[in-house]
UniProtKB/Swiss-Prot annotation:
Keywords: ATP synthesis, CF(1), Hydrogen ion transport, Ion transport, Membrane, Thylakoid, Transport
Residue pairs linked by disulfide bridges in the UniProt entry: none
Organism in which the protein naturally occurs: Prochlorococcus marinus (strain MIT 9515)
Quaternary state and interactors: F-type ATPases have 2 components, CF(1) - the catalytic core - and CF(0) - the membrane proton channel. CF(1) has five subunits: alpha(3), beta(3), gamma(1), delta(1), epsilon(1). CF(0) has three main subunits: a, b and c.
Family (UniProt): Belongs to the ATPase gamma chain family.
Name of the gene this protein is made from: atpG
NCBIfam families: ATPsyn_F1gamma (TIGR01146), PRK05621.1-2 (NF004145)
Protein name: ATP synthase gamma chain
Amino acid sequence: MANLKEIRDRIVSVKNTRKITEAMRLVAAAKVRRAQDQVLKSRPFADKLARVLENIQSRVQFEAVDSPLLSKREVKSISLVCITADRGLCGGYNTNIIKKVEIRYAELIKQGYEPNLILVGKKAIGYFQNRKDKYVIKSTFKELEQVPTAIDSEGITNEVLAEFLSENSDRVEIIYTKFITLVSCAPVVQTLLPLDPQGIAQENDEIFRLTTKNSKLLVEKSNLEKNESDRLPSDIVFEQSPDQLLDSLLPLYLQNQILRALQESAASELACRMTAMNNASDNAKELASTLNLTYNKARQAAITQEILEVVGGSAV
């Protein structure tokens, strides 16, 4: 059995670690709220843009419009945009998304396609750059804001557009972590390009709100409802041709989709970090309790031994 000083030092160390993990949990909770606020602030523009595209879709047939972002061609090369975090200590967040990318990459190779990677986040960059013999990396992005903004999504959008319009990639998919609840998030695969005309309208869109109840953090979700007043008048006349309108609006729509994926990923990362730090705090509390019990037993045994030695010495 370890001596009393070693056990006492271990107890102090565990308690200090618990203070750190608890502080990190609270910081992550505050940042989740910031991520929530950012989503809500960007929502009006995203909603209005989707409504405008939906109305244009109802006025013209997208299939008859010559827009490069809507054109489908024979698929040979596919770009995968992978979004991970720059830091760890967030449970299985990074591991799960990297596994999803590996599985999807292997599937595409098996199907005869030529996949390549556009990596976002230091964790993905570090992992796949150490395996360059197995994966083709097109570009990397790191050190984005913890609460993503349009500036963060702009660079990724430009790279995605350049790959697709130059026909270096015939399809672009994004793999990110969808925010579900504070204790649940899942990696998902979504096609970015070519854009699907039938998928312009944001159906079943959700807004999440982080609230507190009985000193516990909860997530409230509500579906985004369409506002009939947003519909354009049927007699409105567009000065620009449908091609010009779509060439201006579709890149904005694409950037908004990427921004949303970044925001969902950021919220998922912070939620996973909250959960991981909460579990670490609970484990530290349990370990400290066990060590206290061990310390008390060791101290009792030492005292008993000293008493026996004193009694034995008196008898002699």
